[in-house]
């Protein structure tokens, strides 16, 4: 189901969509407005939007820091004032939420134990999905082979230009296939890097789905790269915050 200002989708298990007794994932669009989140800031627009999407569930979030930190929780209060980039849970009354603006939202569901969650995965956090799955195995007794993974809309290698040092890092630590070179420039596929990491971990290939939509190409998404492209290069990230649209991404029963 899609709305005017958000999209939703299903998980896939052995290549088949899960419907009925399964959660779905969702992501706000640029038209929904800025969904940025910090513990010391009030964002009434975000609160109203997520309250409507939650339909009675409790929204749980962490302040993002581009890390590999994932929390396994059973209540909203466990996350108070915490920073990190992922939330997993078995509690169907919770709706884990992260924010993205070109970075990859990753949605998880393990149908055997009912574990689900949401992750924020930029280039620094590439591989956080593996950390989350291992944490779910340790905490909830999950099996990595049962995990369904959806990589949501994010900046693709058509637009994600990186420097040579970062290109080499990804070639060595993930797979050479995740970097392409064109006219002396390097472009990164976050999808290829994360898929490689998941397959190496033992997640089934036909349980992995990746969105084909590039947030930098498509005007319906907020995009740090696209929306800040014309700003002075010496402007700080904090100053740039007002110029790009942060989106919310969630999983909900």
Language-model regions, residue ranges each:
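Active-site microenvironment for binding and transforming phosphate-containing groups
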Residues: 1-253
């Amino acid at each position: 189901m899609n709305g005017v200002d958000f999209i939703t989708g299903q998980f896939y298990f052995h290549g088949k969509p899960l419907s009925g007794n399964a959660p779905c994932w969702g992501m706000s669009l640029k038209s929904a407005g800025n969904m940025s989140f910090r513990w010391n800031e009030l964002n009434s627009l975000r609160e109203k939007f997520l309250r409507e999407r939650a339909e009675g569930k409790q929204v749980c979030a962490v302040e993002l820091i581009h890390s590999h930190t994932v929390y396994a929780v059973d209540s909203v209060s466990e996350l108070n004032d915490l920073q990190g980039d992922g939330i997993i849970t078995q509690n169907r009354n919770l709706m884990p939420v992260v924010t993205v603006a070109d970075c990859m939202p990753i949605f998880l569901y393990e149908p055997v134990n009912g574990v689900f969650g949401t992750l924020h995965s930029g280039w620094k956090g590439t591989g956080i999905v593996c950390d989350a799955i291992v944490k779910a195995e340790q905490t909830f007794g999950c099996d990595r082979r049962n995990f369904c993974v959806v990589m949501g809309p994010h900046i693709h290698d058509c637009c994600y230009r990186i420097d040579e040092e970062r290109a080499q890092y990804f070639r060595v630590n993930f797979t050479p296939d995740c970097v392409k070179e064109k006219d002396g420039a390097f472009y990164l596929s976050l999808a290829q890097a994360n898929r490689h990491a998941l397959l190496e971990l033992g997640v089934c290939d036909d349980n992995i789905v990746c969105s084909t939509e590039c947030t930098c190409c498509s005007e319906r998404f907020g995009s740090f790269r696209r929306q800040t492209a014309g700003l002075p290069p010496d402007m700080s990230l904090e100053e740039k915050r007002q110029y790009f649209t942060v989106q919310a991404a969630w999983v909900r029963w």
